[in-house]
Amino acid sequence: MAARGSGPRALRLLLLVQLVAGRCGLAGAAGGAQRGLSEPSSIAKHEDSLLKDLFQDYERWVRPVEHLNDKIKIKFGLAISQLVDVDEKNQLMTTNVWLKQEWIDVKLRWNPDDYGGIKVIRVPSDSVWTPDIVLFDNADGRFEGTSTKTVIRYNGTVTWTPPANYKSSCTIDVTFFPFDLQNCSMKFGSWTYDGSQVDIILEDQDVDKRDFFDNGEWEIVSATGSKGNRTDSCCWYPYVTYSFVIKRLPLFYTLFLIIPCIGLSFLTVLVFYLPSNEGEKICLCTSVLVSLTVFLLVIEEIIPSSSKVIPLIGEYLVFTMIFVTLSIMVTVFAINIHHRSSSTHNAMAPLVRKIFLHTLPKLLCMRSHVDRYFTQKEETESGSGPKSSRNTLEAALDSIRYITRHIMKENDVREVVEDWKFIAQVLDRMFLWTFLFVSIVGSLGLFVPVIYKWANILIPVHIGNANK
């Protein structure tokens, strides 16, 4: 009986042990899972606790220093992402930049061991003290950058890199437009603090261009920064100036402005290649003059209205317009000479005959004109011959003499007209070569030195690019 009773009791004891072991296993698994989920939650709680402790008595309007005479040193740097536009008319330079600023905030320090090993936090810039560094030479009323988050380290180092879109004033020198080189500057400094309270330290002399997006019209030759101080009767104010030396890419203006202007100036030369009796000579000159006026108006819309300097292309257009005006005057004079005759003008002077009928044609490679004036003419009447005994013969001779004199007179008139026409041709040929020479020399003299100087500007390798 005792043996039979001990068997069921042992079985029940074994089942009880397995049930307890299973429950303990489930409880352990649940506890492990709960411990695994509690770790991120504890990090968030640590960061919440850190922020509450840091900003419980924090006042963002108060300069974060321990003593009144302590100064905050701001490490300042500039990175450019895009040169958006250079407005020559309004003398503005539009840029997208990043303002790199770093300083020590003694009120934002903590021990990472007390907050779960947290060493870096990110808070909005509106929640902490930030230096009021602005762009002094801004032209659109926006002096500050965009509000972004700051990166704060456990030792109190605050890093703030806000992006900004600036329209800064820039004095544009259009003397060598479109082969010009501009120097635009951006001046940064504190708006209210003097140097004894906030000092600016230049982080890097060169502007960071690692993320720069190329512009289709302008190329940055150099972008460097320098520190300066402005003093008045009581205080000194530090500032940082970044100078951007930019070079224009003139391909667009060369194709659509300079080459058409040069072509129009050479069209003026072709006016003198037309025959002197063609009235289209004046029409061609007038059309060229109107076209140059249109180009001058186009340039006036691009460049600023200034009386200090005259742009190179403007000088060339004015030179060409004077050139065309002179060609119109010369053409009118040549047409007038072409239509002269003995009945409208006096006899041609011997010096004019010698120069324009003999000397100049040889120099201009023209076919020599027949010398009708320096050839000795035979006397038509050598004296009184023997009297004819017949009256009919004398009458016939008188008639022949009359006809001969009339024909010779007509020939002389025709020769005078042809001589004037030939002089007009000589003038056209002379001014053709003269204007062609002046056009070539003037174009080369104006553009070649400037283009050579522009082409030899070296683009230095930027430090930021070298460190990529």
Swiss-Prot record:
Side Cytoplasmic, residues: 338-429
Molecular-function GO terms, alphabetical: acetylcholine receptor activity; acetylcholine-gated monoatomic cation-selective channel activity; ligand-gated monoatomic ion channel activity
Gene3D superfamilies: Neurotransmitter-gated ion-channel ligand-binding domain, Neurotransmitter-gated ion-channel transmembrane domain
Disulfide bridge partners, by residue number: 170-184, 234-235
UniProtKB keywords: Cell membrane, Disulfide bond, Glycoprotein, Ion channel, Ion transport, Ligand-gated ion channel, Membrane, Receptor, Signal, Synapse, Transmembrane, Transmembrane helix, Transport
Entry-linked PROSITE patterns: NEUROTR_ION_CHANNEL
Domain of life the protein comes from: Eukaryota
Recorded catalytic activity of this chain's protein: Ca(2+)(in) = Ca(2+)(out); K(+)(in) = K(+)(out); Na(+)(in) = Na(+)(out)
Ion transport listed as a keyword: yes
Biological process terms in GO annotation: acetylcholine receptor signaling pathway; behavioral response to nicotine; chemical synaptic transmission; membrane depolarization; monoatomic ion transmembrane transport; neuromuscular synaptic transmission; presynaptic modulation of chemical synaptic transmission; response to nicotine
The protein's name: Neuronal acetylcholine receptor subunit alpha-5
Gene: CHRNA5
